[in-house]
């Protein structure tokens, strides 16, 4: 991963959001309500942004696009990475805008800049595009060249480029969908599209794409590898690449986590060496998600989840049944818990019935 990247960017945004939710303060948008719009006569970032696409490693869903191919178009550029839950929750809007404005001069371009090493695998990205019904052009930015050309520093991030090639709008994080769509309409109108459809799209987001329950959110993203993890509570502390037998303490404080069984805690993930290893996490949120995958491509790892020592029942996520059973088949984000009100502090446990799983990060919603 490039040293220019702030690996904590999403986590800082989520932490700010949790603080606002806990204080009962409302704020437009979700994660990281950072946005700006430049009028046509302002000192908007001059041309060059579209030339940044020349740094892409590959293109999916489209031949390579650049300034020549996009001349005269309004371009929505979104930086994303396929395991990012914050990006997943923006996806219904990206699909809707693509469909609504495709005949009015809008071109949506996704820039896939990976956070985890396995996200550089093109087969993984192709599978994600198919599973998530992403049909618009995607630039593969594994070398971070496009990211740096835009001076970007967050997932997800939206940039709107006008028909003259100038960056006129930027929004970092989730939310602000009304403002973003209004900016799209304005730039399309400026470009001479007199019949731009008015109003705002209405989306019905389901599963992992549903908006976070901000009022109940008290848990933020946490990585599991020794380099970036927080609140690791197993006796003996972090493993730093060593194979160890871990145990879960009798009690976990909120947002603390622990391992049980034979694990190796590498810098960026934890890897299970023997069957029946567990991860326990004390959380306060509607949703529990875990980025994980088999250590060997093509293998399947069975797991079972419990909440407060009980089967999840109706609180199961989309990747788990009511008895808590699921299977890790690919390297992606798995939604394990989606519970209803009331939301309280609860203890989550996932037991892997087979060895050979790698777990990277928890996210909540």
Residues of each region from the PLM?
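Short active-site neighborhood of thiol/selenol oxidoreductases, capturing the structured segment around
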Residues: 66-85, 108
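Short, internal strand/loop/helix patches
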Residues: 123-161, 290
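N-terminal "domain-start" segment that seeds a small globular fold
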Residues: 34-68
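Non-catalytic, surface beta->alpha helical segment in thiol-disulfide oxidoreductase systems
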Residues: 167-188
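N-terminal secretory signal peptides and thylakoid transit peptides that target proteins
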Residues: 2-20
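Loop/turn elements at helix/coil->beta-strand transitions in domains of secreted/extracellular proteins
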Residues: 72-75, 104-107, 134-136, 163
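Non-globular targeting/processing and membrane-anchoring segments
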Residues: 13-15, 48-54, 181-365
């Amino acid at each position: 991963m490039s040293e220019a990247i702030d690996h904590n960017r999403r986590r800082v945004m989520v932490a700010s959001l949790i603080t606002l939710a806990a204080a009962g303060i409302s704020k437009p948008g979700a994660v990281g309500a950072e946005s700006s719009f430049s009028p046509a006569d302002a000192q908007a970032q001059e041309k060059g942004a579209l030339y940044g696409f020349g740094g892409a490693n590959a293109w999916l869903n489209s031949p390579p696009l650049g300034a020549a191919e996009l001349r005269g178009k309004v371009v929505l550029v979104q930086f994303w990475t396929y395991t990012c839950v914050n990006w997943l929750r923006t996806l219904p809007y990206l699909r809707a805008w693509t469909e609504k404005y495709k005949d009015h001069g809008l071109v949506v371009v996704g820039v896939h800049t990976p956070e985890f090493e396995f996200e550089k695998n093109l087969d993984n990205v192709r599978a994600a595009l198919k599973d998530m019904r992403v049909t618009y052009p995607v630039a593969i930015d594994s070398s971070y060249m496009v990211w740096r050309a835009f001076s970007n520093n967050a997932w997800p991030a939206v940039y709107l480029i006008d028909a003259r090639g100038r960056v006129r709008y930027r929004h970092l994080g989730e939310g602000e969908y009304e403002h973003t769509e209004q900016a799209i309409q304005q730039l399309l109108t400026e470009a001479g599209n007199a019949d731009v459809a008015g109003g705002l799209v209405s989306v019905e987001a389901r599963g992992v794409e549903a908006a976070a329950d901000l009022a109940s959110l008290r848990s933020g993203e946490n990585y599991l590898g020794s380099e970036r993890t927080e609140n690791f509570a197993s006796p003996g502390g972090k493993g730093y690449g060593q194979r160890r037998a871990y145990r879960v303490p009798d009690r976990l404080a909120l947002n603390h986590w622990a391992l049980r069984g034979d694990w190796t805690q590498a810098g960026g993930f934890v890897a299970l060496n023997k069957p029946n290893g567990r991860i326990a996490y004390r959380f306060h949120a509607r949703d529990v998600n875990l980025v994980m995958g088999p250590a060997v491509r093509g293998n399947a790892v069975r797991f079972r989840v419990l909440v407060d020592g009980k089967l999840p029942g109706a609180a199961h996520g989309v990747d788990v049944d009511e008895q808590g059973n699921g299977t890790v088949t690919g390297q992606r984000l798995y939604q394990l818990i989606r519970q209803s009100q009331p939301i309280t502090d609860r203890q989550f446990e996932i037991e892997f019935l087979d060895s050979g799983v790698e777990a990277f990060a928890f996210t909540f919603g």
